[in-house]
């Protein structure tokens, strides 16, 4: 009988990436297969997020539900990971006796050993340390699940914005060696991945060691990734304005694999609030970055993060945010009402903005960005868009679903053979969360760069010419 693993994930794409690595790790080394049903599992893992308010209470509510399963099956192992685990540590075990393992984002690679410790009778195994980049050296080879993949290039953040817990829960910035990243992406490309999304709390702060002891910047890494055979699209998430330097902007000018869509959090359009948030830049500096970006890549679309109702935010501050939204023309946003995170400097500030006022401001902001996004979508009507086909449509499995460069989902009628490839579609209808397309042409009719994967090269016949030069021929 196979051993079953159930993972519940909350939070950002970094957490999604970490959860996939947990599944790979326990699958390869201990033979666990994933199950969607917690009641079927031998191990339950909760990968937590501490960004939003009441994150801890959400964790304990979930653990209360899992406790009933452990009462029925005392051999069930329950683990809590992620940022709440880093923040709370042993306090989780003190409050939820059913928990066996507590681990942080930087120690998930030690899960097999921690599970064995529990099986040997240890009551609580806790490791929420920050062993820098060690976890990437201990994880199994990457496994592709479709034509797109996330690849973590760094961990942590050293910016210490006054509202943010990330430096305390994931540690300071640590970059993976560039060779390791390039190898991982090349392995994914060999498995059919066409688009990679480079992940980190602040990817443009990336400074990774190279094989010869030099330092690879984020701009250089982008160019290296673009040169990998089979990789035709590159995205990255997320960035900080103060390190969005000119060399990164220059990549947009000469690297078509880098998509014409950027998520660049600003949080507020008010200089006074940006200073209180310790963001390290003013609104005009953010606008300067976007102006230079649009000069390098005409038509690039921008999304952002906004915090509404930060302590001391006045109506004038909020008006500055709305003006920035209109000036930039944001296409999308992740926007939230401010909630104090324990241990952050902003948590000590008096929260003097009325909750009803916060809700009203949030509704105004979201409505403004929704209007702008719909306007962009309508401009796409009648145009031909190149999309990467990711799989069947969510609502109609008889149709296909793909994504444009500017991150819009397109549903269309097509053949299953197109999954994992690029197709051109004409946009014929616009909805709030998706577009409707009509198939125009497949990849075999496009003038795409022909990539040779390592297996294809090795499959060719080796032959030396009269000068002794080795050639590989079909």
From Swiss-Prot:
Binds 2 [4Fe-4S] clusters. One cluster is coordinated with 3 cysteines and an exchangeable S-adenosyl-L-methionine. [4Fe-4S] cluster 1 binds at residues 12, 49, 83. One of its GO terms (molecular function) is N6-isopentenyladenosine methylthiotransferase activity. SUPFAM superfamilies: Radical SAM enzymes (SSF102114). Monomer. It comes from the Bacteria. PANTHER family: CDK5 REGULATORY SUBUNIT-ASSOCIATED PROTEIN 1, MITOCHONDRIAL TRNA METHYLTHIOTRANSFERASE CDK5RAP1. InterPro entries: Elp3/MiaA/NifB-like_rSAM (IPR006638), Methylthiotransferase (IPR005839), Methylthiotransferase_CS (IPR020612), Methylthiotransferase_N (IPR013848), Methylthiotransferase_N_sf (IPR038135), MiaB_methiolase (IPR006463), rSAM (IPR007197), rSAM_horseshoe (IPR023404). Residues 378-441 form the TRAM domain. [4Fe-4S] cluster 2 binds at residues 157, 161, 164. It catalyses: N(6)-dimethylallyladenosine(37) in tRNA + (sulfur carrier)-SH + AH2 + 2 S-adenosyl-L-methionine = 2-methylsulfanyl-N(6)-dimethylallyladenosine(37) in tRNA + (sulfur carrier)-H + 5'-deoxyadenosine + L-methionine + A + S-adenosyl-L-homocysteine + 2 H(+). GO terms for cellular component: cytosol. PROSITE patterns: MTTASE_N (PS51449), MTTASE_RADICAL (PS01278), RADICAL_SAM (PS51918), TRAM (PS50926). This is tRNA-2-methylthio-N(6)-dimethylallyladenosine synthase. Signal peptide: none annotated. Residues 3-120 form the MTTase N-terminal domain. Catalyzes the methylthiolation of N6-(dimethylallyl)adenosine (i(6)A), leading to the formation of 2-methylthio-N6-(dimethylallyl)adenosine (ms(2)i(6)A) at position 37 in tRNAs that read codons beginning with uridine. Residues 143-375 form the Radical SAM core domain. Belongs to the methylthiotransferase family. MiaB subfamily. It is found in: Cytoplasm.
